[in-house]
């Protein structure tokens, strides 16, 4: 399902225009383009994005994505997992991959009520980075266990986010 435009930083340029979406050689291609063609749309940029909400629920195991992401100033490609029912940030967010601009690294992050609302981001650390080759396809993964999330890029460990014993609310997504 195509992501509709919203008002958040991450979705304020989303569009339904076909120029932002393509299937080619078995690959889904999502584009971010300057808006020179949609005169009735005031957004300076148009981007394609997809939701898989309601299509697949992961309760454990490995989620792995192979993707090639071109660099551009202002680019913020991301692959996230959100809970099926709980609202953000109560239900948490698992960022399998985020990349900014021309970075040669990928960010992998765990967000939750604990990290976002309570602001506890270092006990345990809630994110890590790993090198990528931007000119190639890279493999981004998270292994979901009852007691931890284990992140990797190209089969190289990035970091592990453990479930810890705490009296604070919402530590583990």
Predicted regions and their residues:
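GH16 jelly-roll
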Residues: 1-173
